[in-house]
């Protein structure tokens, strides 16, 4: 069994010039904690997600490949289940410039992310989309992601 930490964008905020996620990994050993890099949130947090995945080679058994369109905004947190039902209701993809997209339909360089995951020794790559978009159903979005990855 491995304990992995799944990031969001706020772990890339800096403390004394170093991002919080790096501090977490510096303060633990790979035996204690592995990374589970979510490439969408890494990019939203200001990092190059492919380079960030490679930074934790040997400590990245799981990598989340996730695409999006738009820019960071306060409303984007309403697109994930934060457990705060009041905020979820008011923050939707209709009023947010940020939107999760099927893989290959957003701003991410998916080929470089897959290559980075392989180079880092990832045992699993998870294709994730928190919410459907582009007026598609969840199954249509999943098929779009699968078809895009197969085209690479």
Feature annotation, model-predicted:
Residues 1-2, 41:
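Structural motif corresponding to the early beta-alpha repeats
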Residues 2-12, 17-20:
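Conserved anion-binding
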Residues 15-37, 41-152:
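Histidine-acidic metal/acid-base catalytic patches
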């Amino acid at each position: 069994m491995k304990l992995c930490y799944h990031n969001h964008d706020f772990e890339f905020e800096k403390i004394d010039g170093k991002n919080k996620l790096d501090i977490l990994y510096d303060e633990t050993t790979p035996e204690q904690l592995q990374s589970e890099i979510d490439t969408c949130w890494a990019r939203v947090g200001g990092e190059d997600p492919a380079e960030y995945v490679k930074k934790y080679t040997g400590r990245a058994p799981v990598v989340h490949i996730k695409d999006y369109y738009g820019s960071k905004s306060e409303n984007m947190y309403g697109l994930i289940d934060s457990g705060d039902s009041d905020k979820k209701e008011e923050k939707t993809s209709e009023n947010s410039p940020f939107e999760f997209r099927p893989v290959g339909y957003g701003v991410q360089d998916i080929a470089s992310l897959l290559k980075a995951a392989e180079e880092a020794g990832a045992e699993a790559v998870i294709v994730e989309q928190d919410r459907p978009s582009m007026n598609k159903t969840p199954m249509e979005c999943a098929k779009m992601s699968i078809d895009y990855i197969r085209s690479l």
